[in-house]
Every structure is written in structure tokens, then in C-alpha cells.
């Protein structure tokens, strides 16, 4: 989805197959990856160890893991994602079950000259309309995935496996169990801006593919009017292409004023 300025960040538990977070972002900054990770640990606590891709966009996540769990204990394993079968399977499923629909819609819009990816107004409008729709689809699919029976685990769901595994191990003096059951939740109720400022974390300058950020070509008042006028989640008879057209038209009218 990079072509249209979108990227999905996500995490999956290797034992239970529970997806703790899938988040659609309009950039691939390290701060965006960190935001997704913080959202995950607020709900499921800080894991003992995680696997991360070699990409620089995950540097802030590695830093936070070392802050929360301590340095030099192997809290983060870095390497190519192809060595992580769980996450590779997850990305295949996410594309086939959720993203492929929008991939085809966007390609169709380009072929019909409805969408010009070199036009900032078109790109902002595309993201305005489709980011919340895709995020909602990801949320629904995540809930379905976490509630589906796993054939090789006696028909238990990822939710059940995660809960049962946590209860079975709750008495262990391990980092994961201490984080889950005995750590003050306020320690993980952290804000991304505070972390970036406290540890002086800056965006890496060696991210291989940098997604451009499309700012609203509107005044604050016009943008607020857009939010009040056009709901990106409203019903559509054309897979939201009609809503996209209305947003483009609205911006065009505003810019002529």
C-alpha cells in the first residue's frame, strides 16, 4: 500500500497467535511504529522479548523495550522478517483478507483516471476517505482472527490460548509475568510525545522507503467544515469512490474562494 501513502504496523504473539495490534499509518516513521507498539502494550503489557525487522523505523521500539525491560538482556531480536514465520503469515493473511480489496479499488481508480497519485489533493482525499475505512476493516478482521478456533490447538482461539498461557504461568518469576501481573500499570500508560522528548529520540535518516505525508490543503476552519460535512465512513454504493470525489470537489471549491 506504499504507493498510496499507507503502511500497516502490527504485532502478533508467537505462542498464542493473538494479534495485539494492527494499525494503518500514513507514514512509516519510527514514531508511528512506536505509537503502534505502545498501543499494544497498554492492552497486553510489555512482552519479555520481541522480534523486529531490520528496518530503522523500528529503532524507537527497540529503545523502549530496553528502557522497560533493561539493557543487555536480549529483549529485542533483529533480523529479516522472512525469518519470522508468524509475522510473514500474518502479512499474507492481512493482504488477502483485508488489503487486497483496497489495493484493487485504488488500482481501478488510477486506471479510470479518477485518482492521480502525483496530485496532493487526490492523495489527501484518498487518505481522508479510506484510512478510517481500512482501519475499521483491520479491527474487525483482528477480532475475528483472535476469536477463531486454531485447529492444531484443540480448537482453542488465540484469545483463549493467550489467557490460558498467562494464567498457567502467572506464578513464574519471569519478566513477561512480572510485567503482566506485578508491574504498576502506570509505568506502561505512557505517552509517545513524552518518550520522544525524554530520551531525545530522533527520526532515523536511513529508512529505505520514506512515505510522504500529505497535509490538508485547507485552512483549519475549512478542514473542520470538511469533517462536519463529509463522513468518510458513510454508506456508499461505489466502494467509497463517490465519497472520494466529493472530498476532491469540496477542496476544489475551497481553493477557488
Region annotations inferred by a language model:
Residues 1-158, 216-217, 224-257:
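RNase H-like DDE/DDD metal-dependent nuclease/strand-transfer catalytic core used by mobile genetic elements
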Residues 153, 165-257:
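Mixed-charge, low-complexity intrinsically disordered regions
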Residues 161:
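Short clusters of hydrophobic/aromatic residues that line enzyme substrate/ligand-binding pockets
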Amino acid at each position: 500500500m506504499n504507493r498510496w501513502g499507507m503502511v500497516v504496523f502490527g504485532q502478533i504473539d508467537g505462542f498464542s497467535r493473538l494479534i495485539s495490534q494492527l494499525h494503518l499509518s500514513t507514514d512509516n516513521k519510527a514514531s508511528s511504529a512506536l505509537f503502534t507498539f505502545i498501543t499494544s502494550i497498554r492492552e497486553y503489557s510489555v512482552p519479555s522479548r520481541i522480534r523486529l525487522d531490520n528496518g530503522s523505523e523500528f529503532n524507537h521500539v527497540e529503545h523502549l523495550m530496553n528502557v522497560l525491560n533493561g539493557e543487555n538482556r536480549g529483549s529485542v531480536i533483529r533480523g529479516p522478517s522472512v525469518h519470522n514465520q508468524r509475522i510473514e503469515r500474518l502479512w499474507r493473511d492481512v493482504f488477502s483478507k483485508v488489503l487486497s480489496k483496497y489495493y484493487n479499488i485504488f488500482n481501478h481508480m488510477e486506471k479510470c483516471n479518477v485518482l492521480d497519485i502525483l496530485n496532493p489533493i487526490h492523495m489527501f482525499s484518498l487518505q481522508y476517505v479510506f484510512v478510517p475505512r481500512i482501519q475499521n476493516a483491520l479491527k474487525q478482521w483482528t477480532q475475528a482472527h483472535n476469536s477463531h478456533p486454531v485447529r492444531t490447538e484443540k480448537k482453542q482461539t488465540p484469545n483463549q490460548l493467550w489467557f490460558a498461557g498467562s494464567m498457567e504461568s502467572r506464578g513464574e518469576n519471569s519478566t513477561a509475568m512480572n510485567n503482566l501481573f506485578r508491574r504498576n500499570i502506570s509505568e506502561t500508560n505512557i505517552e509517545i510525545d513524552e518518550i520522544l522528548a525524554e530520551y531525545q529520540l530522533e527520526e532515523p535518516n536511513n529508512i529505505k522507503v520514506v512515505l510522504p505525508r500529505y497535509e490538508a490543503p485547507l485552512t483549519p476552519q475549512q478542514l473542520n467544515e470538511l469533517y462536519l460535512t463529509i463522513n468518510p465512513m458513510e454508506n456508499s454504493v461505489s466502494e467509497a469512490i463517490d465519497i472520494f470525489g466529493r472530498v476532491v470537489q469540496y477542496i476544489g471549491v475551497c481553493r477557488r474562494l
